[in-house]
Amino acid sequence: MQYEIGVETMKVLLINGSPHEQGCTNRALEEVASSLKANGVDSEIFWIGKGSIRGCVACGSCGGVSNKCLFDDKVNEALEKMKEADALIVGSPVYYASLNGSLSAFLDRMFYAGACFHHKPAAAVASARRAGTTATLDIIQKYFTISQMPIVSSQYWNMVHGSSAEDVEKDLEGLQTMRTLGKNMAWMLKCIEAGKKAGIDIPDTEDKIKTNFIR
């Protein structure tokens, strides 16, 4: 069963920021996707790949409103998908208590070029052998909070543990946390849609005021 938004189905874009397409991060996202499906919400896992992803060069070509980066690669592919998505989940492996470098460059460019994130629910997921997960989640969530995206939580911090996808199968609490995240994301999307149908509009955004610390 799928929950309908008018004539369209709600959809969540899940970004796999690991260089391993079928690794721990993907296994976590698969569990979220399964839970979303069980709760009537469609999803797609988008893998950023293991090729080189260049960082933002602050050229300003995107203008922050065009939804397109000058460098036409997977970042623009994800932006096109995000235009149609109703929510976003970003997953990353832990590298030195942070997200991996490729994903960092990917998110910098995607969020700077994109104007399609406001008021769409979001969540971060981290995978690690041991520690560094909460620091990684904090960094990813900063992209969401500066973009006016409501953050969806779970029963615990959104993390799984293991050195391989097979290891993650043993992290029963981690997988349950992913399923709860999927349920909560589906619930949030349905609440937002119910609000729209009841006449509750998305908040207006003021023209941005910039104040420098040093003049």
PLM regions: where:
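Cofactor-binding loop segments of dinucleotide-utilizing enzymes, especially the Rossmann-like FAD-
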Residues: I15-G17, I48, A126-R129
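Helix-loop-strand module that forms the ligand-binding subsite of alpha/beta enzymes
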Residues: G64-Y156
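Glycine-rich phosphate/pyrophosphate-binding loop and the adjoining helix
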Residues: P150-R215
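Short, Lys/Arg-enriched N-terminal segments with co-localized hydrophobic residues
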Residues: M1-T9
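Cysteine-cluster motifs in flexible loop/terminal segments that predominantly coordinate metals
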Residues: G51-M82, E206-R215
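N-terminal beta1-alpha1 ligand-phosphate binding loop
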Residues: K11-N39
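A short beta-strand-loop structural module common to alpha/beta enzyme folds
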Residues: V41-G51
